[in-house]
Amino acid sequence: MSRIGKNPVVLPAGVEVTVGEQIVVKGPLGSLKTAAHSAVNVAVEGQNVTVSKVAGAANAAAMWGTMRANLNNMVTGVSKGFERKLQLVGVGYRAQAQGDTLNLSLGFSHPVAHKMPAGVKVECPTQTEILIKGSDKQQVGQVAAEIRAYRKPEPYKGKGVRYADEVVVIKETKKK
């Protein structure tokens, strides 16, 4: 069994945590909320947030580490933020950010316009790079996955939208 839940979450300067029915984390990059699970107790002690199991709860051990990891991600998100980098590989594949909309040319007969949800910003340093930033780790990853799903990297030439750190294994073509 993992012991991630034992470690306290250290609060950096400027980050404030309020515990009630909902746990609210406020920081320089915004505010995030999550529901307090009944199987764990969350307590703020100075500059630390501790998570403890409730005795007798069936899924307390599972939720203990999960709640601690989610709180740590929330604290990191409102203090430093999260970002995900995507690359476009292919002839004529381009991206352009306009406000809260990302316009993509991915070889379809029409351009693809992807609207960003609240709390997520998009930048295009070059025409083939997309940088997704936000304070909610789950939301940043979800938006990146949605954009990648428009044109996943294909296995023969590697064309498509890929994560910057993704390794695409190229298959060899069939020989007679």
From Swiss-Prot:
GO terms for biological process: cytoplasmic translation. Keywords: Ribonucleoprotein, Ribosomal protein, RNA-binding, rRNA-binding. SUPFAM superfamilies: Ribosomal protein L6. The keyword Zinc does not apply. InterPro entries: Ribosomal_uL6-like, Ribosomal_uL6-like_a/b-dom_sf, Ribosomal_uL6_a/b-dom, Ribosomal_uL6_bac-type, Ribosomal_uL6_CS. GO terms for molecular function: rRNA binding; structural constituent of ribosome. This protein binds to the 23S rRNA, and is important in its secondary structure. It is located near the subunit interface in the base of the L7/L12 stalk, and near the tRNA binding site of the peptidyltransferase center. PANTHER family: 60S/50S RIBOSOMAL PROTEIN L6/L9, LARGE RIBOSOMAL SUBUNIT PROTEIN UL6M. Belongs to the universal ribosomal protein uL6 family. Part of the 50S ribosomal subunit. This is Large ribosomal subunit protein uL6. It comes from Dechloromonas aromatica (strain RCB). The gene is rplF.
